[in-house]
């Protein structure tokens, strides 16, 4: 089971460096460093925080803009040094 820190790390990468909100998604193959990637994606998509795009050749993920406030609060709670950086 992935920790909240692992979830926050994935979401912070999506939000901060890649800007993947809503229709802008990134391939899961770019996140190989996360050992529990499938479990993280499953849990976050079940919450509605992560949107999964199943394409014929790859799977893309992005953050759900409907939960932007909650996602940012979660990331800042788990990774306090990012407070005020993610918008």
Give residue ranges: language-model regions.
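Short amphipathic alpha-helical interface segments
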Residues: 2-32
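Surface-exposed polar/charged interaction patches
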Residues: 17, 47, 78-81
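Short amphipathic alpha-helical interaction segments
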Residues: 31-47
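A short, conserved structural fragment
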Residues: 45-55
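Minor-groove-contacting beta-hairpin "wing" of winged helix-turn-helix DNA-binding domains
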Residues: 57-64
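Short, amphipathic alpha-helical interaction segments positioned at domain boundaries
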Residues: 66-87
């Amino acid at each position: 089971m992935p920790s909240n820190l692992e979830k926050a790390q994935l979401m912070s990468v999506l939000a901060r460096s890649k800007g993947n909100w809503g229709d802008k998604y990134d391939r899961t193959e770019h996140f190989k460093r996360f050992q529990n990637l499938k479990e993280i994606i499953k849990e976050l998509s079940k919450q509605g925080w992560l949107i999964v795009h199943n394409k014929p050749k790859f799977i893309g993920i992005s953050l759900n803009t409907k939960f932007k406030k909650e996602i940012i609060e979660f990331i800042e709670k788990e990774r306090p040094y990012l407070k005020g950086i993610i918008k």
